[in-house]
Amino acid sequence: MSTKIIKASAAEPDVFETSISQALVELETNSDLKAQLRELYITKAKEIELHNKKSIIIYVPMPKLKAFQKIQIRLVRELEKKFSGKHVVFIGDRKILPKPSHKTRVANKQKRPRSRTLTSVYDAILEDLVFPAEIVGKRIRIKLDGSQLIKVHLDKNQQTTIEHKVDTFQSVYKKLTGREVTFEFPEPYL
């Protein structure tokens, strides 16, 4: 497989996605990640710019997500070197099924699985974003005007490795879901 991107419905990848795919191919040919990268591919990639800093979101197919996460730390380091310091995040390519209403109930015979609900997908995106850190707690603050602020508590042990990326995580999550989120590293409770 010379290309590392397989899009849904056989659409052609754009120039940016092709460059990401090419970078993955180069990493596969000349690095110690060869064995792990051989079977892996991505479904799409986006570049977003927030606060004068660009970040790259790479979507991976759900069955391959665990394999990507095994090598994610090294892969992110190599890709960030290649793309001159832009932050790189890997996210599983998940689908959200619409909430069944009275009109649509006849159309789909199957019940909507929990993993395809909006809440579940948004929570999973958050977990993918902060990987390899672990979410140890979450608080949702609902203000009087109805807006929500999600406070995510991350593992204190990972603070040194991901603290510099927290702003990127916030902006990427806001862009993907439209939800405000803040990250904290609280002292562990004993």
From Swiss-Prot:
Pfam families: Ribosomal_S7e. It comes from the Eukaryota. Component of the small ribosomal subunit. The ribosome is a large ribonucleoprotein complex responsible for the synthesis of proteins in the cell. Required for rRNA maturation. Part of the small subunit (SSU) processome, first precursor of the small eukaryotic ribosomal subunit. It comes from Spodoptera frugiperda. Signal peptide: none annotated. Keywords: Cytoplasm, Cytoskeleton, Nucleus, Ribonucleoprotein, Ribosomal protein. GO terms for biological process: ribosomal small subunit biogenesis; rRNA processing; translation. Belongs to the eukaryotic ribosomal protein eS7 family. GO terms for molecular function: structural constituent of ribosome. This is Small ribosomal subunit protein eS7. Component of the small ribosomal subunit. Part of the small subunit (SSU) processome, composed of more than 70 proteins and the RNA chaperone small nucleolar RNA (snoRNA) U3. It is found in: Cytoplasm, Cytoskeleton, Microtubule organizing center, Centrosome; Cytoplasm; Nucleus, Nucleolus. The gene is RpS7. GO terms for cellular component: 90S preribosome; centrosome; cytosolic small ribosomal subunit; nucleolus; small-subunit processome.
